[in-house]
Amino acid sequence: MNDKLALIKSSIKSIPNHPKEGIIFRDITSLLEVPAAFQTVVDLFVTRYKEKGITKVLGTESRGFIFGAPVALALNVPFVLVRKPGKLPRETISQTYQLEYGQDTLEIHTDAIHAQDKVLIIDDLLATGGTVEATVKLVQRLGGDVQDAAFVINLPDLGGEARLNALGIDAYTLVDFAGH
């Protein structure tokens, strides 16, 4: 692991038994408290995508906003929000997806993505891939083309990367953590 990735990984605190027994919560808020680590995340994403022809960066509620917005600014492209129901003021479409116990729904403005758009999805963490799969479906329903999905953290034991690959989308992740 190079020094940049080591800085990122060491800045992420692991909180055992949160939000429930047996789960280790990977806390990116501790990374945000280390400006050099936060800047490194943004810089690594920008370096990877600056020559890829991305036309929109999309962030998923809510921690995807933290990393997606500065990347969009650096790439000089619009930043698009994907939110929980009822949070976006203009006309939206929604996509429901399954959780371990139940389901959730995401929404996007219908005029945010167009047929020619090459979209980069950014979120903080890739676990099972359910949230990002729903986000991909929203983009595709609006005619956009998801080029890639980028995450600060990957939990490879939960299978999210394979789920994205099955959709024909590469996952770019900076650091891996074992377990849940």
Curated annotation (Swiss-Prot):
Its main location: cytoplasm. It catalyses: AMP + diphosphate = 5-phospho-alpha-D-ribose 1-diphosphate + adenine. Pathway: Purine metabolism; AMP biosynthesis via salvage pathway; AMP from adenine: step 1/1. Its EC number is 2.4.2.7. GO terms for molecular function: adenine phosphoribosyltransferase activity. PROSITE patterns: PUR_PYR_PR_TRANSFER. InterPro entries: Ade_phspho_trans, Adenine_PRTase, PRibTrfase_dom, PRTase-like. One of its GO terms (cellular component) is cytosol. It is found in: Cytoplasm. Keywords: Cytoplasm, Glycosyltransferase, Purine salvage, Transferase. One of its GO terms (biological process) is purine ribonucleoside salvage. Transmembrane segments: none annotated. Homodimer. Catalyzes a salvage reaction resulting in the formation of AMP, that is energically less costly than de novo synthesis. Belongs to the purine/pyrimidine phosphoribosyltransferase family. HAMAP family: Aden_phosphoribosyltr (MF_00004). This is Adenine phosphoribosyltransferase. It comes from Pasteurella multocida (strain Pm70). The gene is apt.
